[in-house]
Curated annotation (Swiss-Prot):
Domain PAS: 3-73, 140-214, 265-335
Name listed for the protein in its UniProt record: Sporulation kinase A
Alphabetized Pfam families for the sequence: HATPase_c, HisKA, PAS, PAS_3
One GO process term, biological-process aspect: sporulation resulting in formation of a cellular spore
UniProt function note: Phosphorylates the sporulation-regulatory proteins spo0A and spo0F. It also autophosphorylates in the presence of ATP.
Length: 606
C-alpha cells in the first residue's frame, strides 16, 4: 500500500443513536444523545423528515434501503450536522407494524456515528499491530475459491489494509484495465474519490479486526479518470494467511443517472405542487401526510405541524364524517371514479370554508392513499348567494308593486266612504277610529311596498349634514323611547359630517334602525348612535342593548318578510338594505346573545 508510511486518523464508532421513523420517513423519536453527536436537540429533529439531514447523494440509498424489509447488512451514509459539517453514519434498520392489521409501519433506526479518533494510528502492521480477527469471524480465500470467483459477472477484489492483492476479470473490465498488473499492488485509495477516504479507512480497520461493515455507495475512478458509481459490499476475509478485505462491487452508474433524472423531475413536480393556487394534499389512514403551501393558507394554519400527521376529520363537521370516509375509502380501493364534489371545512380560526374536492388514488410508501385537490369556492358561493338574494329582492319588489297598486284603489274607495259615513255613526266613533287606524297602517305598508319596488323613484340626492339629519330623526323618536325607559345617545367625531343622498330615504333608514333598536329593549336601555369618518367613508353605527338576533336569523337579515317582532311586516329592513345599496353604501350587522345588536352603515364620501 502506497500510504503505509503515512499516519492516518481512523474513524471510531461512537455510542448508538436510536430513532423511530414513521412510514413516510418523518422522525417521531430520537434519543437525547443526538445533541452530542449530531448537534441537534431532540425537538429540532422530531417532526422533520430524515432526508432533510442526509447528503443529497445518499438520499436514494437510504430511501431504497428502507423499502427492503430484509436488512441483512447495515447501511452507511453521510449525515449533515447542525454546523453543516458531514459525518458518516452506519445504520441498522428494523421494520415493525404498529397495528394488528398491519396498516401502519414504523422504522426503528439504530445509528452509529463514525468520527475521527484523537490518537494517530497507522494501517502499517509494522508500526501498529491491529488485533487479529478471530477464526470464527473470518472467511478464508483458498485457491479453489479464487478459481470460482475469477469468472463471476460481478466485479470483486481483495485488499490487505487497502492494498489490492487480487481482482477478478469483471473488476478489470470495470476499471478499464487490460491486465491485472495495472491494478494489483496499488492502493485502493487511488481508485476511490477523496471524499470517501476517511470512511474507507474506518471500514478497513474494522474488517482487519474481523468486524462486519455495511453496504455503502462510493464513486471510483477508472484508469482513464472516468468516474463510476458503485455500491460496495465488504466483509473481512483471509487471503494467503493475511487478514484481508473482500469487496463486491456493483456498478450503479445507470441507476445514479436515473436517480438524477428522477430527482430533477421530482423537484419540478414539487415546485409545481408547492406553487399551485389550489390545495394539493395526500391522505393516508385518515391523516394528512402532505399538503402544499396553498393548503396551509386555506386552513389558516400557523405551521405545517398544525396539519401534517393530524386527523382530517378535525376539519370536518361531524355530519360529514361518514360520507367523506366512505368516499376516500372507495377512491383508495379504486371502487369509484374521481368526481368533483362540494365539501365544507373548518379552518383553525373556526371559519367555515367551501371547496370543490377531487380525490385521486395514489400510493404513500407503497401503501394505498388518496391525493386530494381542493379549490376554494367560498367567494363564488358568497357571490351566488348575493345574486340569489338580489333576484329575490327584484322578484319581491315586482310582486310588491303589483300588490300595492291593486290594493290602493279599493282602499281609497273604502276610506272615502268611511269618511262620508262618519257623521252618521254617533256613539260608534271608537270603532270608526280603530278601522281608520288599521286602514292607515295598510297605507303605510303599501308605501313601503312601493319603496321596495322602486327605491330610487323620486330620489333627490343632495349634500346632507348627517349630524343634523340624525338629530331630527332622534328628536322624532326620543319622546316615545323615553316613555319606555330608553335613552337615545348620539356621539360625533365632528360637528359637520356630510354625505350625498336623498334626505327622505335616509331618514327612513335611520327611523327603521332606531325604531328596531328601541323595540328590542322592552325593559329599557340605551341606544347609541355613533358617527365617525375616515379618508374615504362615513360610518354610522346604531347599537342597542337588547337580546340580540339569533344566529340562524342573522344570516338572513334583509330578506323579504323576515321579522322577529310580533307585529312586524318583515319589510322595514329589506327597504333599509335597498336604500343603502342605492346610495352605494354597505351595512354590517354584529349581534351577540344577551348583549345586543349593532348595525354599522358605511357611505362613500363622494
Amino acid at each position: 500500500m502506497e500510504q503505509d508510511t503515512q499516519h492516518v486518523k481512523p474513524l471510531q464508532t461512537k455510542t448508538d443513536i436510536h430513532a423511530v421513523l414513521a412510514s413516510n420517513g418523518r422522525i417521531i423519536y430520537i434519543s437525547a444523545n443526538s445533541k452530542l453527536h449530531l448537534g441537534y436537540l431532540q425537538g429540532e429533529m422530531i417532526g422533520s423528515f430524515l432526508k432533510t439531514f442526509l447528503h443529497e447523494e445518499d438520499q436514494f440509498l437510504v430511501e431504497s434501503y428502507f423499502y427492503n424489509e430484509h436488512h441483512l447488512m447495515p447501511c452507511t451514509f453521510r449525515f449533515i450536522k447542525k454546523d453543516h459539517t458531514i459525518v458518516w453514519v452506519e445504520a441498522a434498520v428494523e421494520i415493525v407494524t404498529t397495528r394488528a392489521e398491519r396498516t401502519e409501519r414504523e422504522i426503528i433506526l439504530k445509528m452509529k456515528v463514525l468520527e475521527e479518533e484523537t490518537g494517530h494510528q497507522s494501517l502499517n502492521c509494522e508500526k501498529h499491530e491491529i488485533e487479529p480477527a478471530s477464526p470464527e469471524s473470518t472467511t478464508y480465500i483458498t485457491d479453489d475459491y479464487e478459481r470460482l470467483v475469477e469468472n463471476l459477472p460481478s466485479p470483486l477484489c481483495i485488499s490487505v489494509k487497502g492494498k489490492i492483492v487480487y481482482v477478478n476479470s469483471a473488476m478489470l473490465s470495470m476499471l478499464g484495465a487490460k491486465s491485472k498488473d495495472a491494478i494489483i499492488g496499488k492502493s485502493s485509495y487511488e481508485f476511490i474519490e477523496e471524499e470517501y477516504h476517511d470512511i474507507v479507512k474506518n471500514r478497513i480497520i474494522r474488517m482487519q479486526k474481523g468486524m462486519e461493515v455495511g453496504m455503502i455507495e462510493q464513486t471510483w475512478k477508472r484508469l482513464d479518470g472516468t468516474p463510476v458509481h458503485l455500491e460496495v459490499k465488504a466483509s473481512p476475509t483471509v487471503y494467503k494467511n493475511q487478514q484481508a478485505e473482500l469487496l463486491l462491487l456493483i456498478d450503479i452508474s445507470s441507476r445514479k443517472k436515473f436517480q438524477t433524472i428522477l430527482q430533477k423531475s421530482r423537484e419540478r413536480y414539487q415546485l409545481l405542487i408547492q406553487n399551485s393556487i389550489d390545495t394539493i394534499a395526500v391522505i393516508h389512514n385518515g391523516k394528512w401526510v402532505f399538503m402544499n403551501e396553498s393548503g396551509i393558507s386555506l386552513f389558516e394554519a400557523a405551521t405545517y405541524e398544525d396539519l401534517i400527521g393530524k386527523n382530517i376529520y378535525d376539519q370536518l363537521h361531524p355530519c360529514d364524517h361518514e360520507d367523506v370516509k366512505e368516499r376516500i375509502q372507495n377512491i383508495a380501493e379504486q371502487k369509484t371514479e374521481s368526481e368533483i364534489v362540494k365539501q365544507s371545512w373548518f379552518t383553525f380560526q373556526n371559519r367555515v370554508i367551501y371547496t370543490e374536492m377531487v380525490c385521486i388514488p395514489t400510493t404513500f410508501f407503497g401503501e394505498a392513499a388518496v391525493q386530494v385537490i381542493l379549490r376554494d369556492i367560498s367567494e363564488r358561493k358568497q357571490t351566488e348567494e348575493l345574486m340569489l338574494k338580489s333576484e329575490k329582492l327584484s322578484i319581491a319588489g315586482q310582486l310588491a308593486a303589483g300588490i300595492a297598486h291593486e290594493i290602493r284603489n279599493p282602499l281609497t274607495a273604502i276610506k272615502g266612504f268611511l269618511q262620508l259615513m262618519k257623521p252618521t255613526m254617533e256613539g260608534n266613533e271608537h270603532y270608526f277610529d280603530i278601522v281608520f287606524s288599521e286602514l292607515s297602517r295598510i297605507e303605510l305598508i303599501l308605501s313601503e311596498l312601493l319603496m321596495l319596488a322602486k327605491p330610487q323613484q323620486n330620489a333627490v340626492k343632495e349634500y346632507l349634514n348627517l349630524k343634523k339629519l340624525i338629530g331630527e330623526v332622534s328628536a322624532l323618536l326620543e319622546t316615545q323611547a323615553n316613555l319606555n325607559g330608553i335613552f337615545i345617545r348620539t356621539s360625533y367625531e365632528k360637528d359637520s359630517i356630510y354625505i350625498n343622498g336623498d334626505q327622505n330615504q335616509l331618514k327612513q333608514v335611520f327611523i327603521n334602525l332606531i325604531k328596531n333598536a328601541v323595540e328590542s329593549m322592552p325593559d329599557g336601555g340605551t341606544v347609541d348612535i355613533i358617527i365617525t369618518e375616515d379618508e374615504h367613508s362615513v360610518h354610522v353605527t346604531v347599537k342597542d342593548e337588547g337580546e340580540g338576533i339569533p344566529e340562524k336569523v342573522l344570516n338572513r337579515i334583509g330578506e323579504p318578510f323576515l321579522t322577529t317582532k310580533e307585529k312586524g311586516t318583515g319589510l322595514g329592513l329589506m327597504v333599509t338594505f335597498n336604500i343603502i345599496e342605492n346610495h352605494q353604501g354597505v351595512i354590517h350587522v354584529d349581534s351577540h346573545p344577551e348583549k345586543g345588536t349593532a348595525f354599522k352603515i358605511s357611505f362613500p364620501k363622494k
